[in-house]
Amino acid sequence: SGLEVDELNSMPGVRSARWAGPECDDAANNALLLAQLAGVPPERRGARFVCALALALPGGGRRLWRGEMPGRIAEEERGDGGFGYDPLFLPDGRTCTSAELTAAQKDAISHRGKAVRAFVAWLKEQ
C-alpha cells in the first residue's frame, strides 16, 4: 500500500511509510509532504491511496487485486483517527479527512477495503 501524489510524480508510493527517512514517524512524513506541497493550489493536490494484494498459487499461478481511494491532500492536518497520512487525505466526495471518518466509513471507501473485498469475493467463488 502507498500514497501516490500527482504533483510529486506519484511519489511517495511504496516508500510512503519511510518518506521522511528510515527512522521517521507519521508526523515527520506528514510534515515533509506538507513542505513539498507548500504553495501548490488545491486543484493540483490530487492523490490516491493504492493497495495491491497478491496471491501466489501452487503450480506457479498468481492473482492480483488492486484497490484505490482517490482524493487530494489538504493544506493542514485535521482529525485524530486513523494513522499515517489520514489527517492530510481528503477522499473524493468528502469534506473531511480520512482521520475524521469513523472506522466503518473509512473501510467502506478505503483502498485496502476495496482490495480485500475483491479478494474475498474471488475466494468465495473458489
Where are these regions (language model features)?
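Anionic-ligand binding patches
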Residues: 1-126
